[in-house]
Amino acid sequence: MAVTPISLRPGVLAEAVVDLGAIDYNVRVLREHAGMAQLMVVLKADAYGHGATQVALAALAAGAAELGVATVDEALALRADGISAPVLAWLHPPGIDFGPALLADVQIAVSSVRQLDELLDAVRRTGRTATVTVKADTGLNRNGVVTDQYPAMLTALQRAVVEDAVRLRGLMSHLVYADQPDNPSNDVQGKRFAALLAQAHEQGLRFEVAHLSNSSATMSRPDLAYDLVRPGIAVYGLSPVPSRGDMGLIPAMTVKCAVAMVKSIRAGEGVSYGHDWIAQHDTNLALLPVGYADGVFRSLGGRLDVLINGKRRPGVGRICMDQFVVDLGPGPIDVAEGDEAILFGPGARGEPTAQDWADLLGTIHYEVVTSLRGRITRTYREAQTVDR
């Protein structure tokens, strides 16, 4: 991969730099895996912490056909920022007013007859036809219409189509074990999904598109691609199957801050609250001005490394709300105040990765990149040619 050095912007305490060139590259990789299927790029949770509007623009330019979000509010935010591409929202609280979504040409996925009724109420109030996808539960047991309620959903949709209240767009579901491509549950869900499509056809309903595959299935189960695939985490360059390595993707996010202070301490002195870490010899320290209020997990205290001037430096002592400390080692000081410290990034320069953090935390890299907040400013590198 061609690496362009990243430097801190003046006056910025800490940055999450999103490389739009990596987004472009990853979308093109996913398009290759998708074959004849179109791409719906998933932008929920502010594009997994990467910034929904900028990622949407980059993904659409790279060939994504549609966008997907969890909530209507997320879809409306894209519309407010001028994004006109098809966008689907699929997670709705009871009593939601779908009117603003219809007026903004947002497609709606419904998981129950009650949700469909609420949507049809908005159709009557606004005079707008709703573009509807049915979200079916094929085994995940989250949102999605359950099997025994599916016939009632189809009957209600038939009436709505006849009344021109609904344009029937799609059938979607979500896999339980997509990160385990060979798990037999994927085949079971695939068969259930195919049966639901057939059941709708028998009842005279034709979905324009069907989609089941998330990132991992897009890259490892071409037999489940159908008409559309819904990659999420892979768009951001994070492997949907970590046991298979990076899968040819480039992580888009680099988190960094400036060294706020450098100081020397004597052997026997402690660092941070409780002095959990005691210097075994004279050493030098660097203070980094980010903490658990910014998404640097407190449980990483004394466990994470950062990259400063080409070297991995271990964190020492407890991570505080606003700051933490790394050990520079004894002898001549090779770090100055204002130098760049990389908390995690693609790993190309030896820095830790989001997956490294996830491994330390016993979690997944999704949680790492979506937890950044507080005083970490998100900035962007414009899309450019990325070689790998």
From Swiss-Prot:
Broad class of enzyme this protein falls into: isomerase
Pathway the protein takes part in: Amino-acid biosynthesis; D-alanine biosynthesis; D-alanine from L-alanine: step 1/1
Catalysed reaction, written as an equation: L-alanine = D-alanine
Modification sites for N6-(pyridoxal phosphate)lysine: K44
Binding residue positions for substrate: R142, M321
SUPFAM superfamilies linked to this entry: Alanine racemase C-terminal domain-like, PLP-binding barrel
E.C. number: 5.1.1.1
Keyword Isomerase attached: yes
Molecular-function GO terms, alphabetical: alanine racemase activity; pyridoxal phosphate binding
Gene Ontology terms: cellular component: cytosol
Residues forming the catalytic site: K44, Y273
Keyword Isomerase annotated: yes
Domain of life: Bacteria
Family annotation (InterPro entries): Ala_racemase, Ala_racemase/Decarboxylase_C, Ala_racemase_C, Ala_racemase_N, Ala_racemase_pyridoxalP-BS, PLP-binding_barrel
NCBIfam families: alr
Protein name as it appears in the record: Alanine racemase
